[in-house]
C-alpha cells in the first residue's frame, strides 16, 4: 500500500491558497524519500490560472439555465473549476440549482438530476462515451461540455496556464524519489493532457480511479 504524505498535502493546500502552488515542496520532500505526495486541482492550477475562453449555447437552451446547471455540478463535485464557474454564474445572472444523484464517472465527467432533467457535464471524450452528438469539425483543446437530456446544451472553452513553479517543483519531487499522486477532480486534468500540453512527467505519477481520487482530495480527510 502507498504511504501517502498527508503533511505534504496540507502544506500544498496552504501554499496554493496564497497562489504559490508547489513552491514549498522541494525542501520538504528532501526529508521524506520514498513517500508519496498528493496533488490536487489547485496545486496545479490555482485560481486565476484557468480562464474562460468563450461560451457557446446550443438549441433552445437559455444561457442562464446552461450556466446554472453546469456551475451546480462543478460546485457539487468539488472540482477546482468551482471559483471560475461561480464568477461566471454571477456575471450571467444565473443561480445554483438543487441537484440530486450526483455521479462521477471514470470517463471524465459528472451526471446529476436537476428539476427532472438529466444533466451531464464533462469532457468531449465523456460526451462521446455517453453518446451525446457533438458538432462536426469541433476544434477545442480544453473545455467543459454540458448536455441536458442527451442533447448538447453548451460548451465552455477553457485556457489552462501552468504556474512557473509547478514544473521545477515536480521535477524536484521526482528527483527526491517522492512520487506525485494525482488526486484531481477536474476531469480535464488527466495524465495525457498534462504530459502533452505541459510536458509534465505524468507517466511517473500515480493516477488512481476516480472514487479514490475523490477520497484522497477530500479536505476533511485527516
PLM region spans:
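Residue-level signature of catalytic and energy-coupling elements of molecular machines
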Residues: 12, 43, 116, 146, ...
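Conserved cytosolic catalytic loops of P-type ATPases
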Residues: 26-69, 113
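ATP-binding catalytic core of ATPases
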Residues: 59-110, 114, 129-130, 185, ...
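Conserved ATP-binding TGD loop and adjacent catalytic N/P-domain core of P-type ATPases
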Residues: 116, 154-222
Amino acid at each position: 500500500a502507498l504511504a501517502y504524505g498527508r503533511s505534504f498535502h496540507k502544506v500544498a493546500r496552504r501554499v496554493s491558497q496564497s497562489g504559490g502552488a508547489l513552491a514549498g515542496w522541494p525542501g520538504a520532500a528532501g526529508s521524506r524519500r520514498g513517500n508519496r505526495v498528493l496533488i490536487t486541482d489547485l496545486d496545479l492550477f490555482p485560481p486565476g490560472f484557468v480562464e474562460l475562453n468563450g461560451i457557446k449555447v446550443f438549441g433552445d437552451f437559455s444561457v442562464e439555465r446552461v450556466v446554472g446547471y453546469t456551475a451546480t455540478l462543478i460546485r457539487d463535485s468539488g472540482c477546482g473549476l468551482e471559483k471560475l464557474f461561480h464568477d461566471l454564474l454571477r456575471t450571467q445572472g444565473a443561480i445554483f440549482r438543487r441537484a440530486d444523484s450526483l455521479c462521477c464517472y471514470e470517463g471524465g465527467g459528472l451526471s446529476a438530476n436537476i428539476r427532472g432533467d438529466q444533466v451531464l457535464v464533462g469532457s468531449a471524450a465523456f460526451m462521446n462515451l455517453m453518446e451525446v452528438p457533438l458538432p462536426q469539425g469541433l476544434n477545442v483543446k480544453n473545455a467543459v461540455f454540458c448536455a441536458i437530456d442527451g442533447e448538447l446544451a453548451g460548451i465552455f472553452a477553457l485556457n489552462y496556464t501552468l504556474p512557473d513553479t509547478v514544473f521545477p517543483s515536480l521535477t524536484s519531487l521526482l528527483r527526491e524519489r517522492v512520487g506525485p499522486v494525482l488526486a484531481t477532480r477536474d476531469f480535464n486534468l488527466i495524465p495525457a493532457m498534462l504530459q502533452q500540453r505541459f510536458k509534465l512527467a505524468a507517466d511517473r505519477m500515480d493516477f488512481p480511479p476516480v472514487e479514490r481520487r475523490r477520497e484522497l482530495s477530500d479536505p476533511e480527510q485527516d
